[in-house]
């Protein structure tokens, strides 16, 4: 096990407790505040610094121009949302899997800072759609992983429709984004943490103005194509820099 593992999780738990306490002290209904966004960004920075993750991001201009928007990304690691929460210049809410909300400390903290719980076993997604619509109307952006799970080998899988249904319903842009490197720092299904570099690339926004739910499949495939293209470029760039093949 890497020496970074225990210090990283210790720092993460302490930062989570601190944010949960601060949000609770501020009282109910404050998850929408700019102060909460700053606390979340600080929380993510603590995790990344402890893990030794060095993050670079391209395409920030696409994000600033599109907000509020739905950011959709490939999913390599549990570290991915932490990277996005720290690196993106957005008031960001994450569509997070139900299992994360069941973890001691993390679940209550996620709810307090306004993250949206997604239960794949539930047949009724209306509550998710309503929460997402409220956040977008309030000026927040959403981060979603259309693959629905992390990829064990970095290969980008098929996309589900949920994020695209939400974007069209609220008539906000989709911003495709690719991430690479997190699977080496915190491999999926494992707890060991290793220092490393992470690259993120945001592509041009896909507008949804005038689109209907009949356009979901086309929008989904356009986003997936953009993410796959951006991801290939990230893999090539990081491989050439390290002099070895990245995957």
Regions found by a protein language model. Give the residues of each.
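N-terminal membrane-anchoring alpha-helices
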Residues: 1-56
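Conserved acidic
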Residues: 2, 6, 35, 39, ...
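Catalytic core of membrane glycerolipid acyltransferases/transacylases, capturing the structured
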Residues: 19-29, 34-37, 50, 65-122
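A secondary-structure boundary/capping signal
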Residues: 59, 73-75, 96-97, 145-147, ...
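Glycine-rich helix-loop-beta junction characteristic of Rossmann-like nucleotide cofactor-binding loops
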Residues: 60-64
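Non-catalytic C-terminal accessory region of glycerolipid acyltransferases
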Residues: 126-247
